[in-house]
Amino acid sequence: MKFTELTVKEFENFVQNPSLESHYFQVKENIATRESDGFQVVLLGVKDDDNRVIAASLFSKIPTMGSYVYYSNRGPVMDYSDLGLVDFYLKELDKYLHQHQCLYVKLDPYWLYQVYDKDINPLTEKNDALVNLFKSHGYDHHGFTTQYDSSSQVRWMGVLDLEGKTPASLRKEFDSQRKRNINKAINYGVKVRFLSKDEFGLFLDLYRETEARTGFASKTDDYFYNFIEHYGDKVLVPLAYIDLNEYIQHLQESLNDKENRRDDMMAKENKTDKQLKKIAELDKQIDHDKKELLQASELRQTDGEILNLASGVYFANAYEVNYFSGGSSEKYNQYMGPYAMHWHMINYCFDNGYDRYNFYGLSGDFTENSEDYGVYRFKRGFNVRIEELIGDFYKPINKVKYWLFNTLDRIRNKLKK
């Protein structure tokens, strides 16, 4: 085996292997996003004796104190069950970094520590051997965190395993609320379409509304546009919306049908108890449809023919479709836009051969008092599998300068207080 810099083509060919647990940050398109942020990029990997790539990682070189912080965001990509390969990679990476002006290195691999069912019952053993291997190479582990941290990627995820399933069989595994709300969205006639680059502002409108409502930390417009500009068809932006013209027409046709059926039944003499009950039920449905029709007509007058309900940013790579971020309109939540969007994207996975639908981030605190308990409950209702990643690892390379860097950082933080 040999540790080496890779060409873009070598890197891309390797990470396109769907059997590798790779992340959307470890794709060739991310080279351009990192460079547009002002960072140099280097592709490092391992080749076997037949010159085949067996490990790869995209590193950003972040200028710091006359040196570089080397950060492989969700890298490296490899068969991490092969501890011998991981050991070789870390050993050779250390040699490379000592020769290339590295201050310290950060790795947060897309590697599993433990897997749980939706109720946090363990399905696998803890992968302590992998964590201990990093530590044996001098890496500091950031810990098994159970909260969001703006300096780290999420460590917990909710994932749907689609392998061997169909949309119908998968839907049977959802809880009653998920099934009911998906059905509501379908009955309302909610549609989903993908936004073009020029329409991305529609996503941002819903995202900013949700940000203001929930108080969650958000990304800047430029952050999103950087991906939109460079990721091409690897970034997907669905929009769930309702066309009130179509909905009102459907409601009116349904109302007319029910009124006609009720009139026919009322015209009959000597009605049975069963017929009277049916008439009473139709009266309730007619009353409901009239209220819905009035509300929809008023909304069309005040808010327009098209109501944008929910939108999201998704990344698709060889391994999975990943829900990165989203927003929705609270005013129109009765139309179940987020459910329509997720159901559409789950079906997109089936249609395009993906075995994983990743709802992505969770804090790891699954108690009712946690900051994202509502998010967990939402994802839990889809019968997700909870995946815990191994976390962040740091290693100082230039130890003297690293000590000085941390000392100055602590002083700056004290001065800010």
Swiss-Prot record:
Keywords: Acyltransferase, Cell shape, Cell wall biogenesis/degradation, Cytoplasm, Peptidoglycan synthesis, Transferase. It comes from the Bacteria. It catalyses: MurNAc-L-Ala-D-isoglutaminyl-L-Lys-(N(6)-tri-Gly)-D-Ala-D-Ala-diphospho-di-trans,octa-cis-undecaprenyl-GlcNAc + 2 glycyl-tRNA(Gly) = MurNAc-L-Ala-D-isoglutaminyl-L-Lys-(N(6)-penta-Gly)-D-Ala-D-Ala-diphospho-di-trans,octa-cis-undecaprenyl-GlcNAc + 2 tRNA(Gly) + 2 H(+). SUPFAM superfamilies: Acyl-CoA N-acyltransferases (Nat). The keyword Transferase applies. Its EC number is 2.3.2.18. One of its GO terms (cellular component) is cytoplasm. Catalyzes the incorporation of amino acid(s) into the interchain peptide bridge of peptidoglycan, using aminoacyl-tRNA as amino acid donor. This is Aminoacyltransferase FemB.
